[in-house]
């Protein structure tokens, strides 16, 4: 299947901190040097949470760019997470290890949408950066190097391996579109340059930068960053996309309006 070059261009972060403080006359504990936080992704379309359905009769209908969409599957990969402190320094989270620093987010598995980051330096953070996909130098189906992520991305309910190449799918969307429920299938990822060597051509990995509306305080109390991903931008972003049926050769043609 031809790779779509659609990239979700708008991801908005809102920050919710759960903490409490009280005045201590004489502190008895040292300030912790490491803390944890959670990045929770919430997938929406417009202002509506996305609900999946096994088939067209059970999937919820959404309107995007005047087109009806229904979703049966939504998955994508997040990796290369970095947090920027208020002093401008950057803390990288296992950026060279897909087993501990890359995640397959699966809309049908709510727990997979919560990325638990542990052993972070305590303090205040003002920005979060991450890659949508996997950067070129790590985008290889290397089971021996990253067995955990390889298995997670390749298991039956994920299927984020490309069949024709050595890299990973970055996005996998399945569902239906139009009033007559035509099949919707959007798979994105880096293109292949040479089918013999499986060399990567166009690198589709993209970095997302989120400036937090309020500093994230990592310390002894739990903290949470809620990141909202608006799938309306799939068709209704800066470039409007109109879906059309496949032609006789099995190739679809996206039409910009």
What are these model-derived regions, one by one?
Residues 2, 22-23:
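Polybasic, lysine/arginine-rich low-complexity segments
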Residues 1-8:
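Bacterial N-terminal signal peptides that target proteins for export
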